[in-house]
């Protein structure tokens, strides 16, 4: 039996050679637990005549990954095999790889079709010796197997469907793409990215330095006008943004309701549902970034709109397909008055924006005055109990996980962009709160800090966090100026207001590394101090930029220009960790370069790349299933696996018990200190999760993607959660509602083939807003 080598030559299969290759990659691993011979034997079983060495490496990596539940070092070995395989298939020098990407010729038409931009190529050519010399390829081996496979699938650039970039090449491309001729800053960014202190968002990793360098994650639009022209002009904007891998939030509260008169044609409106069907089909049609992500939009509606009940049914699993839009996400932009009416079991008037104009343009007391005026004038379409609408909201959430909930008054009252006008919607992932109108499309560029990295020698390094945040601010601020904008209205908005969004990932990992239970007082205190530090560092960096370049165009009249910062709007006094008054004085003197700074996003894909838990979320399970080409296998929370292995507590009995309990360790006989630290999201009171969101909210000037997890949701549980979040002043009341599937049938065996832990889908989830 023979294998085909990379150079095309045939060679007889040699077991010893396969074993030797695997053994070479076991350096530094625990040799008491890692068995290269076992991996090699399984590889031999999968060999067929004419198999390539690339396929052998791929198989060996997958086999090693399947052994991860035996010891965490197998995950490292799997990644090393996969990375080593890529290194053998790609050129080493960064400059040569960039040259190949620039010189790409489309084989279909013979035209020069550069994948990277000419300016990127010029910079690389001028500084190639320096850039080539600072890249440290060993850092590629720091990715875990699934992080590396995520990079391979969507992030590393390809020529004719063959990957040509290594992870380090990608990171240097991103750094050069952002900083261009400022090589020292590019190298600083490269090192921080490659050491995993932070990551830029997926669109930045995809597109920085390329011919179409669209690096922004989020776009917020208002419907231009309640007319055929306005609706279809807005649709075109959405299509052009979606084409360039942007996630969309769209407010439609100004579109007339069904049954309303249309003066131009003397007809009757069909309302928002047929219109949204058109938007849904556009989302389905547009394929973003060459299959990197399908088109996605979140549609925002205020609950006074007469079509609200039909809107809440849009994602239901049953009913007339003509009234469903399964490819759009739905979200509610809820005024406080609605919550008060629900609380008091009052009446709620449903209105048409054509007959009751201006409701979407006002908030707070002004909204209440206008709404009650229309009620007194009997301009409403109908009156129902507020709780009837509320019940429909809850039922939709229990069935579909949506609509998302955002509080209109909190979003406007506590926004540093309040001086621009009324904010009418958020984005696809509910963390961006920015002003948009018919002439401006709001944009946000994102990045996320890997909080686990700042746990150094058993303590959290706040000073290092502040320093890294300041680099991120400078990077995101540069992206605003060099970005490729899909539509001019987006460029106008972004350059006028210059908002950015800094988020986090690995909060749960940081708590675990410090041995803090997620719901402990220590974790709650650290949660506040982390976000206080991020906000402080971001403000300091933005003020320093304003000192050099001037404040953003619409700074005058903002809260910050009057010495009011986000925590003031929450009536919160910061800790004594940072000296706020001198910073406020400096901001009064120089202003800020950016109107908004902090926005914790979901980080779905980038957290997977860096091997961290998502965003600010606790772990959802301590064991789950991964799907790969060779089948399914179990992955255990790496922190838990390591601590149990070190304490000689890990065995098949414990593994099967955790699998039988759906990823929980609370019913095992493990020590109580471990059980407390490794509670899953289902075992942590949601009230604590919401309270921690409010605690950090005082230092988040945009908002945060906050999921609610309730294993067995009910009307009363969800209502209680929503009203608690609203009472605490949250801007985002809920991103998704996550529930547990119905209980599995009684399990008669603990055999791993019979027990199915939760499956984690390996597809891209909200890559656009993934920081």
Swiss-Prot record:
InterPro entries: ATP-cone_dom (IPR005144), NrdE_NrdA_C (IPR013346), RNR_lg_C (IPR000788), RNR_lsu_N (IPR013509), RNR_R1-su_N (IPR008926), Rrm1 (IPR039718). GDP binds at residues 202, 217, 427, 431, 603-606. Maximal ribonucleotide reductase activity requires the presence of Mg(2+) ions. DTTP binds at residues 226-228, 243, 256. The keyword Phosphoprotein does not apply. Keywords: Allosteric enzyme, ATP-binding, Deoxyribonucleotide synthesis, Early protein, Magnesium, Nucleotide-binding, Oxidoreductase. PANTHER family: RIBONUCLEOSIDE-DIPHOSPHATE REDUCTASE LARGE CHAIN, RIBONUCLEOSIDE-DIPHOSPHATE REDUCTASE LARGE SUBUNIT. Interacts with RNR2/OPG047 subunit. This is Ribonucleoside-diphosphate reductase large subunit. It comes from Vaccinia virus (strain Western Reserve) (VACV). The gene is OPG080.
